[in-house]
């Protein structure tokens, strides 16, 4: 019954710290309002509880009656004695089941536009939003931990909040297929992403016909915090953003809802401005690493094809994880004239990567500026590298910053997005013969050594396995070729 699901969800909130004891009645009342109920009790419980309380009260002295009244008042928080208690049955691993029960009830009562994953996600995010602290409370606690304990304690609290709130849907991410592939360049991470649910045809049609809205302008804008969402934009009532200042400008810090790796975070400009790789980019990356030295942070390139999926909003990605590229050794060192204090070398990696290292980030940045400027204008016709064609620039950089012990590092990955009639999606991009595996941009995450593959490959690989075990002629099958 829905009342029991409400009790269990409030208990979950208490046990995960989303809800404080003082917020218990308030949270319960918000949930019963959402579901159109007058009370968290079923009618039978109300009658039984009233009779029992009346009998107990009549047999006690005035002071005993007062004590019983206080006990009864506390029990009325959830409508049933001892039902909502942090010490009761552990609900911390049951969120998916609790929400499913609530969503099934909502669908049965006609509270959803359609019983599909899109509308269920919109509604369960609304549910979880009722358990969330206000943004100011989250920010205050984050920075209290940052100052009084450590940056790592602050991000640990915020990461737990983002998971417990269901902003990061752990039960979906657990379904992702992950493995490691040993190569001459190191152990590469590979994942088949199953945490993004596929939209059903009705939702796709509804999104196509929905009025176009410019609010929020994109998925990274700060206006997403607390937004109810719509059929073509995810709900974010359970989302909280930590404001950070990097290189003197206001940015936001949040986690990716799909966490492709440990504590996968996104750092984004508070203004909706396009991606741009420049001097200020290097300054911002190092400023962030100085504030959060246990995290790496990098930027997608600022040109199509070699950039990420969102070029319209300036942002970085980082996290508490060491990718294969970070572990890869420098196979050839060199010294740049005038920068003898900066260690430089070419990384053993299947892409062109220059690693700069030193204790003075200003010096690293100054050398990075020179490399960027030279690469922007670099042309080598024999290697089919052109700085520009018909006025369109092609050369850019994917930069990644980190702190390693007492030194700072900056990896500069040289990128070029030139296309030809034979390779319209990019000469230095997976060619058409590989598009049955993946054809999307090779962005920051892939550059560092994590291949994020589409969900369809799960079934395709299973079909391929069955065909191989059955001894079928793979070339004779259109589906497998």
For each feature predicted by the language model, list its residue ranges:
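Active-site microenvironments that recognize anionic phosphate/pyrophosphate groups
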Residues: 1-54, 59, 68-267, 271-274, ...
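Helical scaffold of the NTase/Pol beta-like nucleotidyltransferase catalytic core
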Residues: 238-240, 270-297
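Catalytic or ion-translocation cores adjacent to nucleophile or general acid/base/metal-coordination motifs
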Residues: 280, 289-312, 318-372, 376-379
